[in-house]
């Protein structure tokens, strides 16, 4: 694997780990469901794909993968027990992050915004990116030097 790919993969993995923390804080710790058992599949549905190299460009993708979760209508897992609404995996992040919930379960923490994405973007700063880049370079066996000019 080209060394620059190792660096990009390392950075993406750090973003994925930080996202796990943000979902824990902003989604799961905000309340405990009483109508279903939490699977934590939503937290694990965010993927850092392996990077690719094209010419002199390395790129990677961090994304939500709704198909990695299971839908169980009987248990209201990742969707509704109401057949008219059904499987919500495709837009579950939007529902959770915007506090968009139907009237079936009344008011509660699930009707409040629990936006882990906004938290992730706010939490990652330039220092994190620089630190992760340096760590990724070290993991790839590359030396970073500053040329002051």
Q: Residue locations for each model-derived region?
A:
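Non-globular disordered terminal and juxtamembrane segments underlying protein topogenesis/assembly
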Residues: 7-27, 60, 129
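Charged, low-complexity interaction tracts
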Residues: 30-149
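N-terminal, Lys/Arg- and Ser/Thr-rich interaction peptides
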Residues: 1-6
């Amino acid at each position: 694997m080209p060394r620059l790919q190792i660096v990009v993969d390392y950075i993406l993995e750090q973003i994925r780990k930080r996202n796990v923390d943000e979902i824990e804080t902003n989604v799961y710790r905000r309340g405990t469901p009483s109508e279903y058992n939490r699977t934590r599949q939503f937290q694990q549905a965010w993927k850092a794909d392996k990077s690719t190299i094209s010419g002199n460009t390395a790129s990677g993708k961090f994304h939500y993968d709704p198909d990695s979760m299971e839908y169980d209508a009987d248990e209201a897992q990742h969707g509704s027990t109401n057949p008219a609404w059904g499987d919500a995996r495709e837009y579950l992040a939007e529902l959770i992050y915007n506090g968009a919930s139907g009237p079936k379960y009344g008011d509660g923490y699930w009707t409040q915004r629990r936006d882990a994405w906004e938290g992730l973007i706010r939490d990652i700063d330039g220092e994190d990116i620089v630190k992760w880049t340096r760590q990724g370079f070290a993991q790839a066996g590359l030396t970073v030097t500053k040329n002051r000019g």
